[in-house]
Amino acid sequence: MLHITDTAQKYLIKLLSYQKKSTQIRFSVKNPGTPHAQCNISYYLPKTHHNSKDIEIKFSQFSIYLEKHLIPFIQKTTIDIVSNDLGIQLSIKSPNLYHSKNDNHVNNTQNNINYKSPTLENQIKHILTHQINPQLAMHGGSVSLVKITSDSIAILKFHGGCNGCAMAFYTIKEGIEKTLKKLCPELNGVIDSTQHQPGTHSFFK
């Protein structure tokens, strides 16, 4: 159902060691079964935020919690580690994320949001969801695509711990932009549209 490679498990265990005791991992999906599906990984305290609709998937030293209705969408999901300009980060491959529970045919050989002809917008959303946001989530943050301009510039917006973070400019220019341009050669650049407000929520102050 949900596979986490050994290297990814070790990485998560290390991250959890810096958190409050009994902290686990939550796997959530926004708009499952649609072309706009987005998955997210975050820290989770089961005793503090108990949800009767949750199921627990146990691993050797931690557990993943998710809502029961997501089971059909996370079949054959793999969480792994990749290295790029953002450093070491989590990567999520979930081929069934965009399909309805009632779909009779699932193409497991592709992971694009739009399986027939992925647009630049959908390619970027896919990369943000599966490669970049899993890493930012460990800092309590995320980034989303606002729009693609007529000259192929991606307008992005930071959320959570990335809003007001002193490392935001470095992250978007040295990490996110390089990653997106490498995977999407037609992209001409990235602009941060966030109205940054430093505060206790910011990861780096």
Curated annotation (Swiss-Prot):
Cofactor names: [4Fe-4S] cluster
Short name of one Pfam family: Fe-S_biosyn
Keywords: 4Fe-4S, Iron, Iron-sulfur, Metal-binding
Cofactor binding, note field: Binds 1 [4Fe-4S] cluster per subunit. The cluster is presumably bound at the interface of two monomers.
GO MF, one example: iron ion binding
Matching Gene3D superfamilies: Fe-S cluster assembly (FSCA), HesB-like domain
The organism's place on the tree of life at top rank: Bacteria
UniProt KW 4Fe-4S keyword: yes
Chain positions recorded as [4Fe-4S] cluster binding sites: C162, C165
UniProt KW Plastid keyword: no
Entry's Gene Ontology BP terms: iron-sulfur cluster assembly; protein maturation
UniProt-listed HAMAP family: Fe_S_biogen_NfuA
PANTHER family: FE_S BIOGENESIS PROTEIN NFUA, IRON-SULFUR CLUSTER SCAFFOLD PROTEIN NFU-RELATED
Family, similarity comment: Belongs to the NfuA family.
Assembly, per entry: Homodimer.
Function: Involved in iron-sulfur cluster biogenesis. Binds a 4Fe-4S cluster, can transfer this cluster to apoproteins, and thereby intervenes in the maturation of Fe/S proteins. Could also act as a scaffold/chaperone for damaged Fe/S proteins.
Protein name: Fe/S biogenesis protein NfuA
Lineage: Bacteria, Pseudomonadati, Pseudomonadota, Gammaproteobacteria, Enterobacterales
